[in-house]
């Protein structure tokens, strides 16, 4: 009853893992250390896909192993990672369609009570987890900055993956495409 629940969004396009990855990567740092981030964008619910829990820079993440944490992996500084497979921390009855309720929420509650990650399941190496192939911003042969539209918000704004460093690099090119 003392937990604060912050619902970041319900506006992710259905099953859009890339959009989810960007929202997680761009929002988690605004929460205090110790925050438990539960990610339930899960096209594989009810299948044999794994659920993982990890620690990164004092934050905990609980998500399906479907690539939604790709950008966190790329950012580095990942601590412990476990495959959440200890049923002692799940509800007794697990449905095929509500793992958010039956697994993610109870495991998140146990994390909030201080249970160690290692108690939740089997250690796993980051290289064994699913990562999405997400195009990185680049400068084309035509000297154009090319990025990916990650999502279009409800106001029609295009949110891209073009970051400050990519834009800065592009803006420092002369007309011939060489750095100034």
Range-by-range predicted roles:
Residues 2-4, 11, 15-22, 26, ...:
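Active-site histidine-anchored catalytic micro-motif
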Residues 82, 92-174:
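Anionic-ligand-binding alpha/beta catalytic cores of soluble enzymes and soluble regulatory domains
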Residues 176-180:
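Short conserved beta-strand and strand-loop elements enriched in small hydrophobics
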């Amino acid at each position: 009853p003392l937990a604060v629940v912050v619902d970041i969004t319900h506006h992710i396009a259905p099953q859009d893992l890339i959009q989810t990855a960007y929202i997680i990567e761009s929002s988690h740092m605004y929460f205090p250390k110790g925050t438990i981030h539960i990610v339930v964008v899960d096209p594989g619910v009810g299948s044999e896909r794994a659920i993982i829990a990890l620690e990164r820079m004092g934050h905990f993440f609980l998500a399906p192993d479907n690539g939604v944490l790709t950008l966190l992996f790329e950012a580095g500084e990942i601590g412990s990672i476990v495959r959440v497979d200890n049923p002692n921390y799940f509800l007794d009855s697990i449905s095929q369609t509500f793992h958010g309720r039956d697994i993610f929420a109870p495991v998140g509650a146990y994390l909030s009570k201080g249970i160690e990650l290692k108690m939740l399941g089997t250690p796993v190496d980051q290289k064994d987890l699913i990562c999405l192939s997400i195009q990185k911003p680049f400068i084309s042969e035509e000297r154009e900055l090319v990025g990916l539209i990650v999502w279009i918000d409800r106001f029609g704004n295009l949110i891209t993956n073009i970051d400050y460093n990519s834009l800065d690099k592009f803006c420092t090119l002369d007309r011939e495409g060489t750095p100034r």
